[in-house]
Amino acid sequence: MKTYFISDLHLAPSRQDITDCFLTFMKNEALEADALYVLGDLFEFWIGDDDTSEFANSIRQTFIDLVNTGVPCYFTQGNRDFLVGKKFAKQTGVQLLDEVSTIDIYGQKAVVLHGDTLCTEDIKYLAFREKVHQPWLQWVFNRIPFFIKKKIVSKVQSDIKDDKQTKSLDIMDVTQQEVENVMKQHNVDLMIHGHTHRPNIHSFSANNCTKTRIVLGDWYTQGSVLVFTPQSFELQNREFSNRF
């Protein structure tokens, strides 16, 4: 019995090594899972569910194949693929989760999320996030011709890259108070998230209870998977050699 959690793969046609590692994982290990959770930023950038490129279709197909074997797949939108929507879910069979969701893992209650909303000191990003998550703006964007959307996203990507180079690393990490607030709000002792690219397992005390926060790793130089069983959990790496 195993449940897998992954995030921050940043899949893109330019990184075939990441894609190959992901596809191998999906066609092998994932087949044995009780469930697979993707906690955001599966894609480097998802322009919209109307992306019918060969690359996008290959990723869709791997989810279709896995779901058809009976393995449930859950998807949380990240800051780079927040436009993954109901059409993608219907096409692939994945189940879209709320921005912050409470789940049961082998009898243990946990809160799962991408993690960007925990970085409360990054005021500039949170303001940008609030704008692009407005339903009316997404409604308009989704109706723009795809080739125009690609140009818009290319400009946004460039601006994001420039902005990150001038930011302090500290403000791009979570704030402990927000972590505790979310865990208290959802009445859990376990949180799982990605986003920060700082894989680790943190234990701390709050409200006279021991809490655990698991941070998923990114896939920039190697794959990263949280393997959760009824008895234990462990962050594991996967080399880009495709050997599992």
Swiss-Prot record:
InterPro entries: Calcineurin-like_PHP_ApaH, LpxH-like, Metallo-depent_PP-like, UDP-diacylglucosamine_Hdrlase
Pfam family, one: Metallophos
Cytoplasm in keyword set: no
Topology in membrane: Peripheral membrane protein
Catalytic activity: UDP-2-N,3-O-bis[(3R)-3-hydroxytetradecanoyl]-alpha-D-glucosamine + H2O = 2-N,3-O-bis[(3R)-3-hydroxytetradecanoyl]-alpha-D-glucosaminyl 1-phosphate + UMP + 2 H(+)
Keyword annotations of the record: Cell inner membrane, Cell membrane, Hydrolase, Lipid A biosynthesis, Lipid biosynthesis, Lipid metabolism, Manganese, Membrane, Metal-binding
CDD domains noted in UniProt: MPP_YbbF-LpxH (cd07398)
Co-factor: note: Binds 2 Mn(2+) ions per subunit in a binuclear metal center.
Binding site for Mn(2+) 1: D8, H10, D41, H197
Pathway noted in the entry: Glycolipid biosynthesis; lipid IV(A) biosynthesis; lipid IV(A) from (3R)-3-hydroxytetradecanoyl-[acyl-carrier-protein] and UDP-N-acetyl-alpha-D-glucosamine: step 4/6
GO biological process, one term: lipid A biosynthetic process
EC number: 3.6.1.54
The protein's required cofactors: Mn(2+)
GO molecular function: manganese ion binding; UDP-2,3-diacylglucosamine hydrolase activity
Localization terms from the record: Cell inner membrane
Record-linked SUPFAM superfamilies: Metallo-dependent phosphatases
Highest taxon of the lineage: Bacteria
Enzyme class, broadest EC rank: hydrolase
General function of this protein: Hydrolyzes the pyrophosphate bond of UDP-2,3-diacylglucosamine to yield 2,3-diacylglucosamine 1-phosphate (lipid X) and UMP by catalyzing the attack of water at the alpha-P atom. Involved in the biosynthesis of lipid A, a phosphorylated glycolipid that anchors the lipopolysaccharide to the outer membrane of the cell.
HAMAP family: LpxH
Family: Belongs to the LpxH family.
NCBIfam families, per the entry: lipid_A_lpxH, PRK05340.1
Protein name as annotated: UDP-2,3-diacylglucosamine hydrolase
Gene: lpxH
